[in-house]
From Swiss-Prot:
On ligand binding, forms a receptor complex consisting of two type II and two type I transmembrane serine/threonine kinases. Type II receptors phosphorylate and activate type I receptors which autophosphorylate, then bind and activate SMAD transcription. Positively regulates chondrocyte differentiation. Its cofactor is Mg(2+); Mn(2+). The gene is BMPR1B. Residues 1-27 are annotated as: Disordered. This is Bone morphogenetic protein receptor type-1B. Changing residue 486 to W: Strongly decreases positive regulation of chondrocyte differentiation. PROSITE patterns: GS, PROTEIN_KINASE_ATP, PROTEIN_KINASE_DOM, PROTEIN_KINASE_ST. Keywords: ATP-binding, Cell membrane, Chondrogenesis, Disulfide bond, Glycoprotein, Kinase, Magnesium, Manganese, Membrane, Metal-binding, Nucleotide-binding, Receptor, Serine/threonine-protein kinase, Signal, Transferase, Transmembrane, Transmembrane helix. Belongs to the protein kinase superfamily. TKL Ser/Thr protein kinase family. TGFB receptor subfamily. Glycans are attached at residue 44. The lineage of its organism: Eukaryota, Metazoa, Chordata, Craniata, Vertebrata. Disulfide bonds join 32-53, 34-38, 47-71, 81-95, 96-102. Residues 204-494 form the Protein kinase domain. Residues 14-126 are extracellular.
Length: 502
């Protein structure tokens, strides 16, 4: 076995030990006691050597003490008898040459345990110190990075969609119409790419507020000189924002009688958040606003009615193909949620409550939204809570009831015989300006009343047919109501009979 330790010398050689040297080698053969280190030809645990006798004690892996005795040859023994500490190993050796069997009386002792513990503890202490130092430096660097990033954000304008120099993804000269046509021709059919939407949102300049409702505010803005409408949702209306964005980006959703979707984005920091929905801008405003200030001739009435039901028909119709469109019900149809274009046609807006029909699973995808529709336009099955929420056709028929009321609003503003009524909301003469569920339930469900027709309608064929049409839309029994497609075809025939091109 290798012996790489030094000696504690016997009495005969203590002087040499104090000087750091091994005892002088014997002049003749020396007999030594051997134990655990006996040569094969040894007799009675005895060995002979021309060098030294030794005794060594060492600690094994289990913590026990192992004593070994034997002979060291002259060559190299001087080095082996020197006590050189070995890291992580406790051992000690003593050598002697004074007389035969002198190692019988050698009793080396192990070095104190505290020396090793101190060394190991010192190493652990250094490792801990280094680790703490490195972690502290990293933490300081992270804090500095976060601080400068925060200051950089704070230095930006607080106006959430101020003009920024971020036109990387939209080449100069591209109009909104160009971008939308490109997205449609690309085959995705689900609107502009998200990166383009975010870029547009950043570049919009807010001009003036044009409306405010329970969901938030509507602003007129500009993007590269083009007017756009920016719907800014309250943070409490995030579900409506998400749902409306999702519906607008449904494949094959774009239609001339559905409000044109441009972009959606979320702006803000940890302390404030704003939700934007950017759409086409229509300066005539809602159908409600338009009817309050504008009277109609027969052509104008039919254009408003036909274009509105065309948008509703597109919503209600599912398209089955590799990139199909699900059938969608609006659930909050009213004159304030229909916009009037410059050309006198309508487009349907505000899809925050819309539901989709998943044809693959035959399920209704209802938004997780606490908001409900407008009580004045609610059908009887919603007011008396008899609507089957798991049957998609129930929502379609509920939309048709609401659309019947919208037809009534439009028809009242059509001039016939030089007579026209002031604009009024449905049931204006039967319920308060802000009716409760109970008010509407009593009128619509219990008394089964509907808006009344002016006497002049009976003397005008077109208005008479309109009256018949709306009655078939707001029938008490949902199954008896006309579909949007049926209403669309009827209005088309009425236009032909009046020689009116829509």
């Amino acid at each position: 076995m290798p012996l790489l330790s030094s000696s504690k010398l016997s009495m005969e050689s203590r002087k040499e030990d104090s000087e750091g040297t091994a005892p002088a080698p014997p002049q003749k053969k020396l007999s030594c006691q051997c134990h655990h280190h006996c040569p094969e030809d040894s007799v009675n645990s005895t060995c002979s050597t021309d060098g030294y006798c030794f005794t060594i004690i060492e600690e094994d892996d289990s913590g026990g003490h192992l004593v070994t005795k034997g002979c060291l040859g002259l060559e190299g023994s001087d080095f082996q008898c020197r006590d050189t500490p070995i890291p992580h190993q406790r051992r000690s050796i003593e050598c002697c040459t004074g007389q035969d069997y002198c190692n019988k009386h050698l009793h080396p002792t192990l070095p104190p345990l505290k020396n090793r513990d101190f060394a190991e503890g010192n190493i652990h202490h250094k490792a801990l110190l280094i680790s703490v130092t490195v972690c502290s430096i990293l933490l300081v660097l992270i804090i500095i990075f976060c601080y400068f990033r925060y200051k950089r954000q704070e230095a930006r304008p607080r106006y959430s969609i101020g003009l920024e120099q971020d036109e990387t993804y939209i080449p100069p000269g591209e109009s909104l119409k160009d971008l939308i046509e490109q997205s449609q021709s690309s085959g995705s059919g689900s609107g502009l790419p998200l990166l383009v939407q975010r870029t547009i949102a950043k570049q919009i300049q807010m001009v003036k507020q044009i409306g405010k409702g329970r969901y938030g505010e509507v602003w007129m803005g500009k993007w590269r000189g083009e007017k756009v409408a920016v719907k800014v949702f309250f943070t409490t209306e995030e579900a409506s924002w998400f749902r409306e964005t999702e519906i607008y980006q449904t494949v094959l959703m774009r239609h001339e009688n559905i409000l044109g979707f441009i972009a959606a984005d979320i702006k803000g920091t940890g302390s404030w958040t704003q939700l934007y929905l950017i759409t086409d801008y229509h300066e005539n405003g809602s159908l409600y606003d338009y009817l309050k200030s504008t009277t109609l001739d027969t052509k104008g009435m039919l254009k408003l009615a036909y274009s509105s039901v065309s948008g509703l028909c597109h919503l209600h119709t599912g398209i089955f193909s590799t990139q199909g469109k699900p059938a969608i019900a609006h659930r909050d149809l009213k004159s304030k949620n229909i916009l009037v274009k410059k050309n006198g046609t309508c487009c349907i807006a505000d899809l925050g409550l819309a539901v989709k029909f998943i044809s693959d699973t035959n399920e209704v995808d209802i938004p997780p939204n606490t908001r409900v529709g407008t009580k004045r336009y609610m059908p009887p099955e919603v007011l008396d809570e008899s609507l089957n929420r798991n049957h998609f056709q129930s929502y379609i028929m509920a939309d048709m009831y609401s659309f019947g009321l919208i037809l009534w609003e439009i028809a009242r503003r059509c001039v016939s015989g030089g007579i026209v009524e002031e604009y009024q909301l449905p049931y204006h003469d039967l319920v308060p300006s802000d009716p409760s569920y109970e008010d509407m339930r009593e009128i619509v469900c219990i008394k089964r009343l509907r808006p009344s027709f002016p006497n002049r309608w009976s003397s005008d064929e077109c208005l008479r047919q309109m009256g018949k049409l709306m009655m078939e839309c707001w029938a008490h029994n949902p199954a008896s109501r006309l579909t949007a497609l049926r209403v669309k075809k009827t209005l088309a025939k009425m236009s032909e009979s009046q020689d009116i091109k829509l």
